[in-house]
């Protein structure tokens, strides 16, 4: 799944970044949607609010698959209110064990006032060791830039925007049209 020309590799063509600092959580994504080597759209929104605006969620991967997973996550949050980690683990269990869900191709970052998590189809729910996490083709560039800026910038959004711009300058599957969601924590 690493060849960007392969249509199955479509989930690699994006960047989503989450940064926590000084009472603020910010999640950003680029807007580029690529199919193989073709840019299909430049202003897609890959970050959004769920659970009544209390949780920020971003995705890399097939859009329909991601929305299916967001709906499932919201159902888990209704069952386990204010327990993002528990809901994420329950979603990961379903994603790993239900045949229908196993075919979904997406990665999710979800965050509330207390935690930031990456949820994968392999059944992983990962909480980053640092206050920064990213996914997608430009994710490593954005992550490295954000971690490098973290000690020198006071504002989470400033860190996020600068890091995303660096990723957009390096990764051909990431553009400079950013969607930004913030949450006071």
From Swiss-Prot:
GO terms for biological process: proteolysis involved in protein catabolic process. Its EC number is 3.4.25.2. It catalyses: ATP-dependent cleavage of peptide bonds with broad specificity. Na(+) binds at residues 168, 171, 174. Pfam families: Proteasome (PF00227). CDD domains: protease_HslV. The active site is at residue 14. Allosterically activated by HslU binding. It is an enzyme of class 3 (hydrolase). Its main location: cytoplasm. SUPFAM superfamilies: N-terminal nucleophile aminohydrolases (Ntn hydrolases) (SSF56235). GO terms for cellular component: HslUV protease complex; proteasome core complex. Keywords: Allosteric enzyme, Cytoplasm, Hydrolase, Metal-binding, Protease, Sodium, Threonine protease. GO terms for molecular function: metal ion binding; threonine-type endopeptidase activity. It is found in: Cytoplasm. Belongs to the peptidase T1B family. HslV subfamily. A double ring-shaped homohexamer of HslV is capped on each side by a ring-shaped HslU homohexamer. The assembly of the HslU/HslV complex is dependent on binding of ATP. Protease subunit of a proteasome-like degradation complex believed to be a general protein degrading machinery. This is ATP-dependent protease subunit HslV. It comes from Hyphomonas neptunium (strain ATCC 15444). The lineage of its organism: Bacteria, Pseudomonadati, Pseudomonadota, Alphaproteobacteria, Hyphomonadales. The gene is hslV.
């Amino acid at each position: 799944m690493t060849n960007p020309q392969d249509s199955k590799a479509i989930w690699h063509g994006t960047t989503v970044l989450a940064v926590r600092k000084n009472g603020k959580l910010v999640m950003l994504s680029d807007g580029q949607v690529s199919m193989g080597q073709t840019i299909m759209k430049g202003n897609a929104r890959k970050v959004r609010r769920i659970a009544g605006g209390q949780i920020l969620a971003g995705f890399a991967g097939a859009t329909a698959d991601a929305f299916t997973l967001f709906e499932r996550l919201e159902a888990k949050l209704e069952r386990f209110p204010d327990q993002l980690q528990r809901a994420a683990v329950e979603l990961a269990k379903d994603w790993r064990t239900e045949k229908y869900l196993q075919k979904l191709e997406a990665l999710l970052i979800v965050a509330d006032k207390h935690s930031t998590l990456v949820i994968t189809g392999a059944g992983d729910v990962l909480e980053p060791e640092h206050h920064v996490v990213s996914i997608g083709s430009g994710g490593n560039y954005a992550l490295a830039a954000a971690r490098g800026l973290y000690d020198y910038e006071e504002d989470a959004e400033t860190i996020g925007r600068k890091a995303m711009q660096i990723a957009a300058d390096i990764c051909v599957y990431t553009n400079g049209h950013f969607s930004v969601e913030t949450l006071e924590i």
